[in-house]
């Protein structure tokens, strides 16, 4: 059932494709951007993802290699690219949002920028200043491959404005995905960024 929520997913990797599929199944109108034309063509032609066994991308997910076609007038924008590319993409997205209603922005990417030591949400806000109260992070002990397979998945959605967080949870969660609101955005981002470091360290010890 269509719900009139417009979604832009930036990055059609494992997390981007998984969340695009979940939101499309909820009835959202989903536009995904993928920089790799070969991957974009594969998703469009085959509706499968090489890293997600058994995954099917719903037919109502549109995939583009042109950013301006993926970011038209979204209610929800998901940033699901490698953290190294967040600043350049946020800078390119900013003019596409000018004069329009600001979407709820959710970072799925995790990482800290070299040199500035800014988190993904902080980078987004630096490049899109009016997004400060609407930029959130989704993080937790979760894996895209499990969510794509339909496994019950729980994560937190952390942001500075809890009213905005709760509105975004209503848009984003559904099916096997359950989200809990969180006020500590910085803590959530740092925890998500450092968890792999801790895992490697634990393995060495």
Predicted regions mapped to residue ranges:
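NAD(P)+-binding Rossmann beta1-loop-alpha1 motif at the extreme N-terminus of oxidoreductases
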Residues: 1-56, 61-65, 92
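Internal alpha-helical scaffold of NAD(P)-dependent oxidoreductase catalytic cores
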Residues: 85, 96, 123, 127-133, ...
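Hydrophobic anchor at the start of a short beta-strand
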Residues: 7, 30, 133-135, 179
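Rossmann-like NAD(P)(H) cofactor-binding subdomain of soluble oxidoreductases
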Residues: 64-72, 76-79, 83-152
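Cofactor-binding loop segments of dinucleotide-utilizing enzymes, especially the Rossmann-like FAD-
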Residues: 12, 35, 108-110, 160
